Amino acid sequence: MSEQVIIFDTTLRDGEQALQASLSVKEKLQIAFALERMGVDVMEVGFPVSSPGDFESVQTIARNIKNSRVCGLTRCVEKDIDVAAEALRVAEAFRIHTFIATSPMHIATKLRSTLDEVIERAIYMIKRARNYTDDVEFSCEDAGRTPIPDLCRVVEAAINAGARTINIPDTVGYTMPHEFGNIIASLYQHVPNIDKAIISVHTHDDLGLAVGNAMAAVHAGARQVEGTLNGIGERAGNCSLEEVIMAIKTRHDILNVHTNINHQEIYRTSQLVSQICNMPIPANKAVVGANAFAHSSGIHQDGVLKNRENYEIMTPESIGLKEVQLNLTSRSGRAAVKHRMEEMGYQDNDYNLDDLYSAFLKLADKKGQVFDYDLEALAFISRQQEEPEFYHLDYFSVQSGSSVMATASVKLICGEETQSEAATGNGPVDAVYQAINRITGYQVSLVKYQLTAKGQGRDALGQVDIVADYQGRRFHGVGLATDIVESSAQAMVNVLNNIKRAQQVEKEIQRLQQHNNQQQNDSKQQNSQETV
């Protein structure tokens, strides 16, 4: 009987570190729901002590996720662990993941400590975390460059302290597969209490070996793999979970292990992460790339037509990739749209049908036919806009040409008021943005602008993803329309609403801090009076 490999997803923690702008709580929650639907066993959703925003997102996800274990990351620091426990305690099941560096280089130059002191600190912090939950994971940061005897000492002590999962990271993507497999095998050989914990691995792709190292570790006995969807992450990225999952499924004959992943959800989840994180998937990306199941060579095409297994070791259907269909028009009713969403695997609570159908009719009037990917894009945008927004784009008009300066007129709905302005700019998009800045009074500067075609042909939707700077902080915005200038305007309006929301959060945090300070002062005065 094959053993299970636990899939530990860190897209919302390690993966998010690669993004130019942080995701909103709503965006993180949408990804978390998709990961839960895909069947990940554990999802690491943030670093709660790092910021009030991260604390809020971890707590929100912990409150809403029911079928996956929610995890928060901490350093081996008391405050980190206490704050993580506070954020996670609303979850039905949660894990605290704490780490400390173990390589000689990190201990000497970063921690300015000794191995004995590191072990002592790890033991204390693991026990502290165990006060909050039985599910504690401990990571030996830079384990790939830690001498095996030292690593064995740390792992044995961590297990004795109560860690149920021991994670072995190749933090800088340095090791080769045979080396990394040997590290895992050595732990099984030399750590006497190794049977009391699950051995996990966390690999990075600096040398393009993250998946290879993870598979070598699984072959050597590791039973948890950490990674991200599409391999997103710092520097060259993390281990691509979709590749690990399909490698385990495809090469069961060699590995004799399995996962509890719903493989039919892989492609959809991958696309969702790509869209929300504004990180396009390379066409030649294994498993989920546009060319992963494409055959252009005549010999290959002939072989596939005769028997797909000649050149396909897995099928598009095995990851939930279905053929694009041309079956929805402006004459299609709500029931048809709902049925198509069900066929694509969406549940009723994944999207707002009223908003989706309204947006669908507008698009269908423009395009005539609406594709599956159009429908998903509209559902995604509708999901983002479910909460009332302060700013709405009411109207815009642009005049531009090769011999005239671009001029834009924009009308925004700002709460209960409507305001209009006109401005010139370096092109139609810049003119629109200058007019919007005049209306709001925000001096928002564009940092990154990316246009992606969603669909095919002249009627394709244009998705504009932007990163904008406001008072030293970066905000992400997305817009979707058949008109590029319109989608650009929508993206900036999305940024404005994110800025407005961030300001409201800051005010609420200040109010809570003032309230807490007042309570502390009142308590001190009361204690002083009692003493007198």
From Swiss-Prot:
Uppermost EC category: transferase
GO biological process, any: L-leucine biosynthetic process
Location in or out of the cell: Cytoplasm
Gene3D superfamilies: 1.10.238.260, 3.30.160.270, Aldolase class I
Recorded name of the encoding gene: leuA
Keywords: Amino-acid biosynthesis, Branched-chain amino acid biosynthesis, Cytoplasm, Leucine biosynthesis, Manganese, Metal-binding, Transferase
Reported cofactor(s): Mn(2+)
Keyword Chloroplast set for record: no
EC number(s) given by UniProt: 2.3.3.13
Major localization listed first in the record, in broad terms: cytoplasm
Record organism: Pectobacterium atrosepticum (strain SCRI 1043 / ATCC BAA-672)
CDD domains to which the protein is assigned, alphabetical: DRE_TIM_IPMS (cd07940)
HAMAP family: LeuA_type1 (MF_01025)
Region annotation Regulatory domain: where it falls in the sequence: 392-532
Domain Pyruvate carboxyltransferase: 5-267
SUPFAM superfamilies attached to this UniProt entry: 2-isopropylmalate synthase LeuA, allosteric (dimerisation) domain, Aldolase
Subunit structure: Homodimer.
Disulfide bonds: none
PANTHER family: 2-ISOPROPYLMALATE SYNTHASE 1, CHLOROPLASTIC-RELATED, HOMOCITRATE SYNTHASE-RELATED
Protein name: 2-isopropylmalate synthase
Reactions it catalyzes: 3-methyl-2-oxobutanoate + acetyl-CoA + H2O = (2S)-2-isopropylmalate + CoA + H(+)
Known function: Catalyzes the condensation of the acetyl group of acetyl-CoA with 3-methyl-2-oxobutanoate (2-ketoisovalerate) to form 3-carboxy-3-hydroxy-4-methylpentanoate (2-isopropylmalate).
Pathway linked to the protein: Amino-acid biosynthesis; L-leucine biosynthesis; L-leucine from 3-methyl-2-oxobutanoate: step 1/4
Family indicated by similarity: Belongs to the alpha-IPM synthase/homocitrate synthase family. LeuA type 1 subfamily.
Pfam families in UniProt: HCS_D2, HMGL-like, LeuA_dimer
InterPro entries: 2-IPM_HCS-like (IPR050073), 2-isopropylmalate_synth_dimer (IPR013709), AIPM/Hcit_synth_CS (IPR002034), Aldolase_TIM (IPR013785), LeuA/HCS_post-cat (IPR054691), LeuA_allosteric_dom_sf (IPR036230), LeuA_bact_synth (IPR005671), PYR_CT (IPR000891)
Record carries keyword Manganese: yes
